[in-house]
Regions:
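Cys-dependent protein tyrosine phosphatase-like superfamily
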Residues: 1-96, 108-204
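Ser/Thr-glycine-rich phosphate-binding loops at phosphate-binding pockets of nucleotides
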Residues: 101, 105-106
Length: 204
């Protein structure tokens, strides 16, 4: 499973690079958290770079467009996400998950899936914060104050949501795997589906 900025929406001038890297990694299925199918068609019509690889996946039914907003605590977000995760169950990887920047919506979804597969707080945080280093040069070594502020404001809210901890509640002893399961089962995903999803994401 990979995450990136959009490989098709080039508003930040990253799409050609994201698409090239995803293709080189052998990505076979894309979970597009940001766009509608109509928006994807519009990107094809206005593309100023080679969209052949992305369009071949799309035409084969290997791109799921979820059109999520950034409110991962909202019911609509969770319902739409589950629809996309069911598509992952039905398709072989490697998988690419992206929104526009690959930061907010993608950061939450990847942390949720990492938690589901048994990742620790530190593992989820370290993966999430790579984005802030890539975009803004914010990392623990060179800019610890800003790094800690982003973790406190952004990532810890994600961690609380996944763990089912109230806003500003303590994360001590949080069970992220159990919380991730509950986040998904609360909107109708079955235990069988969750286990199949984990199998897809962790198989070699």
């Amino acid at each position: 499973m990979y995450r990136s900025a959009s490989p098709i929406d080039n508003q930040n001038n990253r799409a050609p690079y994201a698409a090239d890297l995803a293709q080189r990694c052998g990505v076979q299925f894309i979970l597009d958290l940001a766009d509608t199918n109509e928006e994807i068609q519009g990107y094809y019509q206005n593309a100023d770079y080679d969209i052949t690889w992305h369009k071949s996946l799309y035409d084969a039914g290997n791109v799921a467009a979820l059109n999520l907003n950034a409110n991962y605590r909202g019911g609509q977000y969770a319902y739409r996400l589950v629809a996309g995760l069911r598509e992952i169950i039905l398709h072989k990887g490697p998988y690419l998950i992206h929104c526009t920047e690959g930061k907010d919506r993608t950061g939450f979804v990847c942390a949720l899936l990492e938690a589901l597969c048994g990742a620790s707080y530190d593992e989820m945080r370290d993966d999430y914060m790579i984005t802030y280093d890539n975009y803004y040069g914010i990392n623990e070594k060179d800019d610890k104050a800003r790094y800690d502020a982003v973790v406190d404001v952004k990532f810890d809210d994600i961690a609380r949501c996944i763990a089912g901890v109230p806003t500003y509640g303590s994360l001590d002893g949080a069970d992220y795997a159990a919380g991730a399961r509950k986040y998904l089962t609360d909107v109708g995903m079955t235990e069988w589906e969750i286990n199949k999803l984990i199998e897809r994401l962790t198989s070699k």
